[in-house]
């Protein structure tokens, strides 16, 4: 049995409703801080079970052009790393479940323990760390244990059996399965590597598996929800963000319907 995490009850609730969890990502501070907070609380009302609050970073090597451009806009408009705690608090106050998604450098510069402490105080439940591997995560593992935060590492189709098992063993809450190789972004077709990757995870653990990188419609959400515990949507929501809260809510509701009809 996997060690239960803060997000375990969210996935348990979704399983009880015989559906996958909907996990929505938006970059903090895009297009500006106040608007991003409004958009993320809109995701809660639109049916997202977990909100990923992205920290804008100047070298987003794993992001597609849509998210990279949004991060650039957020940074140009003055968003700071510490602003993420304000956003997480707003999501929590709206009844949502918030995790942070960040490259490791901003957290490292802030101070790993200080970041974890403030995130927990704001109601945050964990951090997704796309460019951090468990072998190099001693400080984060210690801080997450100290402040009761979930650790979400990434696995990919290219992960060796040993790497997969080690990564899953270090996760708490859920594991992020990257369904396509390379950078993220909305695609017309969802990778057929994803079901095989989810099966590999389930061979070694009962931890919840969230699949991301490519979903942009309710139909695609339903496709992934048929075999995954969580459906992660990022670029499509970022694309809707400039159109305002109504557009973001409409897409969230479509996706929420999708994860319920798998």
UniProtKB/Swiss-Prot annotation:
Residues of the active site: 52, 63
UniProt entry keywords in alphabetical sequence: Amino-acid biosynthesis, Aromatic amino acid biosynthesis, Lyase, Tryptophan biosynthesis
Chain's role: The alpha subunit is responsible for the aldol cleavage of indoleglycerol phosphate to indole and glyceraldehyde 3-phosphate.
Annotated family: Belongs to the TrpA family.
Protein name: Tryptophan synthase alpha chain
Record pathway: Amino-acid biosynthesis; L-tryptophan biosynthesis; L-tryptophan from chorismate: step 5/5
The enzyme's E.C. designation: 4.2.1.20
Pfam family of the protein (one): Trp_syntA
Entry keyword Lyase: yes
Subunit structure: Tetramer of two alpha and two beta chains.
InterPro entries per record: Aldolase_TIM, RibuloseP-bd_barrel, Trp_synthase_alpha_AS, Trp_synthase_suA
GO MF annotations, alphabetized: tryptophan synthase activity
GO cellular component: cytosol
Superkingdom of origin: Bacteria
Reaction(s) catalysed (UniProt annotation): (1S,2R)-1-C-(indol-3-yl)glycerol 3-phosphate + L-serine = D-glyceraldehyde 3-phosphate + L-tryptophan + H2O
């Amino acid at each position: 049995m996997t060690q239960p995490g803060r997000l375990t009850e969210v996935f348990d609730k979704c399983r009880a409703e015989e559906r996958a969890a909907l996990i929505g990502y938006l970059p903090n501070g895009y297009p500006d801080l106040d608007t991003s907070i409004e958009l993320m609380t809109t995701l809660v009302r639109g049916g997202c079970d977990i909100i990923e609050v992205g920290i804008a970073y100047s070298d987003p090597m794993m992001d597609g052009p849509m998210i990279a451009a949004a991060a650039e806009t957020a940074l140009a408009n003055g968003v700071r790393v510490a602003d993420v705690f304000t956003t997480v608090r707003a999501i929590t106050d709206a009844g949502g479940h918030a995790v942070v998604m960040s490259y490791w450098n901003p957290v490292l510069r802030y101070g790993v323990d200080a970041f974890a402490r403030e995130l927990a105080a704001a109601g945050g439940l964990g951090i997704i760390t796309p460019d951090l591997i468990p072998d190099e995560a001693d400080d984060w593992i210690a801080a997450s244990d100290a402040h009761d935060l979930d650790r979400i590492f990434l696995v990919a189709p290219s992960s060796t059996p040993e790497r997969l098992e080690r990564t899953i063993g270090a996760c708490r809450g859920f594991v992020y399965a990257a369904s396509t190789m390379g950078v993220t972004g909305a695609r017309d077709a969802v990778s057929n590597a994803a079901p095989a990757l989810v099966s590999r995870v389930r061979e070694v653990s009962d931890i919840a598996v969230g699949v991301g990188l490519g979903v942009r419609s309710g139909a695609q959400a339903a496709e992934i929800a048929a075999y995954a515990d969580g459906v992660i949507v990022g670029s499509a929501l970022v694309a809707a963000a400039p159109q305002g809260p109504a557009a973001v809510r409409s897409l969230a509701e479509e996706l929420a319907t999708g994860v319920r009809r798998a």
